[in-house]
Amino acid sequence: MTRRRFYAPRIAFAADSNTITLSDDEARHARDVLRLGRDDEVFVFDGEGREYRCVIADIGSRSMTLTVAEETEAAKPESRLDLTLAVALLKGEKFDLVVQKATELGVTRLVPLITTRADVRIRDPQDAARKVERWQRIALESAKQCGRARLTLVNAPTDLDELLRSITDVHLGVMFTARDGGSVEAAFESKPDFKTVIAMVGSEGGWTDEELTQARKHEWQLVTLGGRTLRAETAAIVAATLLQHRLGDLG
């Protein structure tokens, strides 16, 4: 039987962790769409990796209270790979697709990247906040669908220079590029003791020569995804899939 899964952040848990109050949106979906009632069984995940089997205790007009029966294993286990995927801002629904598929593929964090050739510009902090809120909602819906108990965290849009400088000894930085790149195996061998991976994918226009030079300067590894020209959203999905296959839980 398919689990009826709902999201509740830790703030929604009572101090003793025995009861959970669902948000208005989650409660409305349970009550009005799924037609659930008192004593029905549901599952709740907290976005941090924990999942609980619960029973509906009370139904209000704008909320729903659940009694926690037990902590249970998540519907799907998390990948052992701590993967940050940074993708140049893309037009329209392309970035929405990246958010959805990155969540399904077990990406830990998603960074909207501001690059020279990015398809979209951020007008002001309010515009950035609206976009991040939208993308985080997409990540939440995708997590519900694919069975993850941990949410992919969508960061605020970040300048490429800032991300390039953020690399440390425990990070393996991989810049996927259509030119001047090597193999993913060579990238792994360049820093055998890495703990996490930060992978970057550019826009349709690719990276500028200056961006490639800066990446090398900060010891990022340049990697190609084969000889075919991929759309940016396809490249992002392929990059995440490749890294999860080699280092995570795919295959």
Where are the regions that the model predicts?
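Generic structural signal for residues in well-ordered beta-strands
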Residues: 66, 151-155, 222
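Structured adenosyl-cofactor binding patch, chiefly the S-adenosyl-L-methionine
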Residues: 209-251
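Short, acidic/turn-prone active-site loops that include or flank metal/cofactor-
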Residues: 72, 204-205, 227-230
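RNA substrate-binding interface of SAM-dependent RNA methyltransferases
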Residues: 73-175
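Active-site/ligand-binding-proximal alpha/beta "capping" segment
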Residues: 170-206, 211, 220-223
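Glycine/charged-rich beta-loop-alpha catalytic/anionic-binding loops adjacent to active sites
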Residues: 20-22, 80-84, 195-198, 217-225
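N-terminal positively charged helical leader segments and presequences
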Residues: 1-74
